[in-house]
């Protein structure tokens, strides 16, 4: 069989790639459910690793074929409702962009699962984790290949479910259960609003494939108000999936789950929501209000997430808020019709953030501590982890020549022509991110060893090897971006722009290096400064605001509804029952037991009824 035939077959059967992940979940179920308890407990882990590797290799072959021969659509007819003028197909878009995103997902999933093999070495529920990881991978792979909005919505719902299950992995801890519930409910808000938009579009467009939706959007006859409401409903789902303001709290809650799952959430799960948003943009651009909302949300998330991250002491939360900030930049690029820039930013961010998450996961594994004020001196004891953190941080903060430098340069150049103010947000975010990562590095890896780090040692090879692989990937990110580059060239910006981007990163690095830490940023005695510190540390009191507004409103409405149901509905029914019982009791006491009395009562009643009837007739 020739190579060209193999490549062609790999593309024809590309629809199998999402199924690989679900197959990994299925083969893990006998161990995850306890049907097999004692025999080879690591077998499901090895099976899932093999399946993820097969998915990655299959995607690589398909990508080579598509780059040579062009994209095509794989379509399986599913449901045709001619009376309702609605046709639903299982449709996959096998394009270079989608396959590149698929390779990112399957590759990072494989590396994260290999990392989990060492991180969860002593975990009794290892099979359950790998079953959920397979489910996770299958849903994400389906989202990026999907060419149908209905199909994408269904797969996004699967992502929400898998997030709930993975965050609640250690369900014996009450805090974990609460975090899983809060993360699920927060994402459900966006999912329900997206469902409203999907249902509305199914009635308007007559088909749910994106090409059908684009054709309908060009002929859109809806009123401006209806178009705006539809657009706001459609963006709600991606806002929740990408952890954007005001639905960003779930990513912070999700940090209660195992760190290998956090690697995927911080890197590729949020990417899936952004990809769905990009596919919806030809529809959303018909509403200027929707675009303005996207820009506002992206700006608030980028600046707010960056500011909040520098006030956190939980090492995992310093990265989760940084993820919110970078996805805010992606939202700005998408709203300003720069999808290629958004894709490159997602690509560079995902690889660097995955490596950062692995490095801090290694720190947590050896110290059993997430509070950076209790860590220190790990640089000399964990050289591989330290190197991974440094390279990942440099790749994320736009330092030449690593990946995000080229993304920020392109962002400054392309967005600066349209809206210079939004281009400045890229620089501010880069500066604050560099400040945050430098602060964490000084706190964790430099200084004297703390009690929890004095006996720390480098992690095992199963955790170190994935970090080394990703370290190389971060270093090669510019080369990979050039290969899949949908723009004229990743270096197609002026030297002044490049110097500006590099300077913004160096400014943040310098501030982070000179600011006094003293093992913690102590609360200032100056009241205004203390207020700012608390404002950032508590995420602008977003959760308290929700509690005082939405939660209290819903609780009040629930109380009123409960009172109405208890006092009015149940009260009326109970009153009728009590009245019947009391009437029967009174009637029982009035009975004499004589037949003459019964006959007389019946006769009187009949006479009364006849008299009333004759009166009514007359």
Swiss-Prot record:
The keyword Translocase applies. It is an enzyme of class 7 (translocase). It is a multi-pass membrane protein. Its main location: plastid. The chain crosses the membrane at residues 16-36, 43-63, 99-119, 129-149, 152-172, 190-210, 220-240, 267-287, 291-311, 318-335, 348-368, 390-410, 419-438, 461-481, 495-515, 553-573, 597-617. It is found in: Plastid, Organellar chromatophore thylakoid membrane. The keyword Phosphoprotein does not apply. It comes from the Eukaryota. One of its GO terms (molecular function) is quinone binding. It catalyses: a plastoquinone + NADH + (n+1) H(+)(in) = a plastoquinol + NAD(+) + n H(+)(out); a plastoquinone + NADPH + (n+1) H(+)(in) = a plastoquinol + NADP(+) + n H(+)(out). GO terms for biological process: ATP synthesis coupled electron transport; electron transport coupled proton transport. Keywords: Membrane, NAD, NADP, Organellar chromatophore, Plastid, Plastoquinone, Quinone, Thylakoid, Translocase, Transmembrane, Transmembrane helix, Transport. One of its GO terms (cellular component) is plastid. Pfam families: Proton_antipo_M, Proton_antipo_N. NDH is composed of at least 16 different subunits, 5 of which are encoded in the nucleus. Belongs to the complex I subunit 5 family. PANTHER family: NADH-UBIQUINONE OXIDOREDUCTASE CHAIN 5. NDH shuttles electrons from NAD(P)H:plastoquinone, via FMN and iron-sulfur (Fe-S) centers, to quinones in the photosynthetic chain and possibly in a chloroplast respiratory chain. The immediate electron acceptor for the enzyme in this species is believed to be plastoquinone. Couples the redox reaction to proton translocation, and thus conserves the redox energy in a proton gradient. This is NAD(P)H-quinone oxidoreductase subunit 5, organellar chromatophore 2. It comes from Paulinella chromatophora. The gene is ndhF2.
């Amino acid at each position: 069989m020739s190579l060209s035939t193999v490549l062609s077959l790999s593309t024809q059967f590309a629809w199998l790639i999402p199924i690989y992940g679900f197959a990994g979940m299925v083969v893990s179920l006998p161990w995850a459910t306890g049907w097999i308890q004692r025999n080879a407990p690591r077998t499901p882990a090895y099976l899932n690793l093999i399946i993820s590797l097969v998915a990655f290799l299959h995607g690589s072959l398909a990508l080579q074929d598509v780059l040579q021969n062009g994209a095509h659509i794989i379509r399986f007819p599913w449901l045709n409702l001619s009376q309702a003028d609605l046709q639903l197909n299982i449709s996959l878009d096998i394009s270079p962009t989608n396959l590149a995103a698929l390779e990112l997902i399957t590759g990072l999933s494989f590396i994260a699962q290999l990392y989990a093999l060492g991180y969860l070495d002593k975990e009794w529920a290892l099979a359950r984790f790998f079953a959920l990881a397979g489910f996770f991978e299958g849903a994400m792979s389906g989202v990026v290949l999907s060419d149908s909005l209905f199909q994408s919505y269904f797969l996004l719902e699967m992502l929400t479910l898998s997030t709930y299950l993975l965050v609640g992995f250690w369900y014996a801890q009450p805090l974990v259960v609460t975090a899983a519930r809060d993360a699920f409910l927060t994402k459900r808000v966006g999912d329900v609003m997206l469902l409203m938009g999907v249902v509305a579009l199914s009635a308007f467009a007559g088909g749910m494939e994106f090409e059908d939706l684009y054709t309908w959007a060009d002929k859109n006859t809806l009123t401006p108000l209806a178009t705006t409401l539809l657009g706001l409903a459609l963006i709600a789902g991606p806002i929740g999936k990408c952890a954007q303001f005001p639905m960003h709290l779930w990513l912070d809650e999700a940090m209660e789950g195992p760190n290998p799952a956090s690697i995927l959430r911080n890197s590729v799960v949020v990417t899936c929501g952004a990809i769905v948003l990009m596919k919806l943009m030809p529809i959303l651009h018909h509403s200027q209000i929707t675009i303005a909302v996207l820009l506002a949300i992206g700006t608030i998330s980028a600046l707010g997430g960056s500011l909040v991250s520098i006030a956190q002491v939980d090492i995992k939360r310093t990265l989760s808020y940084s993820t919110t900030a970078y996805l805010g930049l992606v939202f700005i690029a998408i709203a300003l019709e720069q999808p290629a820039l958004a894709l490159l930013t997602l690509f560079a961010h995902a690889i660097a953030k995955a490596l950062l998450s692995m490095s801090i996961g290694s720190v947590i594994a050896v110290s059993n501590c997430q509070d950076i004020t209790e860590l220190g001196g790990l640089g000399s004891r964990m050289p591989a982890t330290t190197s991974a953190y440094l390279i990942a941080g440099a790749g994320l903060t736009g330092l030449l020549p690593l990946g995000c430098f080229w993304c920020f340069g392109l962002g400054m150049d392309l967005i600066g022509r349209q809206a210079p103010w939004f281009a400045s947000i890229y620089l501010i975010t880069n500066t604050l991110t560099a400040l945050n990562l430098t602060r964490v590095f000084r706190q964790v890896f430099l200084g004297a060893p703390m009690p929890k780090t004095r006996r720390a040692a480098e992690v095992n090879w199963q955790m170190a090897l994935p970090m080394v692989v990703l370290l190389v990937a971060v270093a090669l990110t510019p080369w990979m971006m050039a290969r899949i580059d949908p723009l004229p060239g990743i270096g197609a910006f002026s030297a002044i722009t490049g110097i500006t981007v590099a300077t913004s990163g160096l400014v943040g690095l310098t501030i982070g290096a000179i600011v006094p830490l003293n093992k913690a940023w102590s609360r200032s005695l100056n009241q205004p400064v203390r207020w700012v510190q608390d404002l950032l540390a508590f995420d602008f009191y977003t959760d308290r605001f929700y509690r005082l507004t939405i939660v209290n409103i819903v609780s009040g409405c629930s109380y009123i509804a409960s009172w109405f149901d208890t006092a009015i509905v149940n009260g009326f029914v109970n009153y009728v029952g009590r009245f019947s019982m009391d009437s029967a009791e009174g009637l029982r006491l009035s009975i004499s037991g004589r037949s003459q009395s019964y006959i007389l009562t019946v006769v009187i009643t009949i006479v009364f009824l006849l008299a009333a009837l004759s009166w009514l007739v007359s």
